[in-house]
Amino acid sequence: MKRKILIAVGDCSHSRSAVKYAATLSQPAKDTTYTLYNIQAAIPGILLEEAPKNPECEAEIEALVRERDNAAKCTVGELKELLVKHGVPESHIEVWITPMEYGMAKDILDQAEAGNYDTIVLGSKGLTPRRDVFVGTTATKVVEHALKTSVWVVDEYTESRDILIAVDASENSLHVLDHVIASIGGKKGFRFVLFHVRPYLSHYYSLECERNNPNLQKLIQDRDRHRMEDFYKEAFARFETAGIARSQVEIKTNEHGYDISTAILEEARRGAYGTVVIGRRGEREAFFTGRIAMRLVQKMPSAALWVVA
């Protein structure tokens, strides 16, 4: 199955970390392509309108554009070499350099949709224009609005091959596993931890409702245990089919996670995982959606965070 990875890059250390991470972690399959996507800072419209009236200003703008273009080509060229150095065939790498049109995050999302990319990879910092710094980072906005494309946010390069995958018993969690398996393939040395937060009525309603309905609380947890047993059977079958040994996969359950994002953050930091993976949707309406994904990308519990669409 053909896979396309869009790596949004700039001249910053976080972009270099993102490129190296994508090259070393993802499976360099023969049908996987990597696009290095560089968005150049736009020349303010007022300068473009007024400069032609002043030859000296027009010459300065032309020099500024040449300098910008040359810097972008140099940056992307270095990052392409980094991909090749870490095992990606040069024939699998595409380069796209373009001026900003609507804004950094919007342009990345539009390119991902137009190119039908499976995954967006970007650094947690470094791509946000100065004028947008108080609006929110590019990574945060991409995660918030990439409803159909998975996003990998990389804070720093890591050699850790420990991956924490937050799961519930939903079909979407199986889709998350499929994304992990397709991205990593049968590469050796990885450890996968399937992390489940036991459901509470307070995940749906108030704490008072939970206290006042002990039978419902027991019912929801008993049912969850049975459903997770079925989920794990299917999960192990999919790992095995992909060539991932049973010894590489662990199960962890948080029985007292009244706040789901906090439970994930605590486990991620306690276990010092290199990568944390969550799904955008789950059984509980708020389980891995908006609020939780946004909190995790702001806190960055690991070197890399995946939000799987």
Give residue spans per PLM region:
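Structural beta-alpha unit
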Residues: M1, P44, R66, E78-I120, ...
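A short acidic, glycine-rich active-site loop
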Residues: C57-C74, P214-D230
